[in-house]
Amino acid sequence: NKCDDRITRRVYLSKEKEVSIKVVYFINNVAAHNNTIEIPQTVNGGYDFSHLSLKGIVIKDEDLSNSNFAGCRLQNAIFQDCNMYKTNFYYAIMEKILFDNCILDDSNFAQIKMADGTLNACSAMHVQFYNAAMNRANIKNTFLDYSNFYMAYMAEVNLYKVIAPYVNLFKADLSFSKLDLINFEHADLSRVNLNKAILQNINLIDSKLFCTWLTNTFLEMVICTGSNMANVNFNNANLSNCHFNCSILTKACMFNTRLYRVNFDEASVQGMGISILRGEENIPIDSDTLVTLQKFFEEDCTSHTGMSQTEDNINAVAMKITADIMQHAD
């Protein structure tokens, strides 16, 4: 068959081969008379796909642990039910790639360029995503414990039912993103850009959001108990049923902000700038009296502090969020 960019073939892998495997599919850098290439094994027992340009490959139920895809160009590729432990994708380019029910723990996705990629029902713990470009990525039903997204560009990403305690998102860009049913407990979201994002059912207990940008952001049922949110920017945001009790909000900004049933009990609010939108009226509030204005907020229905939310109540809500995330997890 001629080597045509419209031709896609399934990749066949077999760990029973001692030295190498044969892969039959379209590869840009294979001569027109031969679209079969042998993929050598790496020193760690995986396969070396490095710097190949692969289109339309489908790999199912294979052991690709310790394989090397560094510098690869992967277009419309599918990896399903694969063990990809410690796989290297450093500097790979991915277009509409799908990882479905794969083990990606301890893998390297640093400095990848991914567009419209999907991680579904994957285990991606301790993975390096630093400086990765993952715009419009779709990550759902996935474990991201302890993974590193330092300075990752993830604009317009969709995160749904994700377990990600201790994840590092320092200086990441998640603007215009949608996050729902996420466990970010003990995570670092400092200096993260969440402008114009939608956050719903988020557990951020004991997390860091120092100097994080949340302008024009919608937050509903976001629990930040005991979190460090100093210098965070909520300007023009809309907050509903959120909990900031026992958190540090020193020098935080909440100008032109709409608040409904927001809990600031025992929060540190020194130097906080806040003005609440009530209809078209913008009402400035002294941060020193913020927590004591319960009656005003109840009647105004703009915000509600002192909601009789005990620590046990709030922990129960956080546990329910985690339980909802885990409902369909294996």
Question: For each predicted feature, which ranges?
Answer:
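Tandem repeat scaffolds
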Residues: K2-C3, I7-T8, Y12-K17, V24-A329
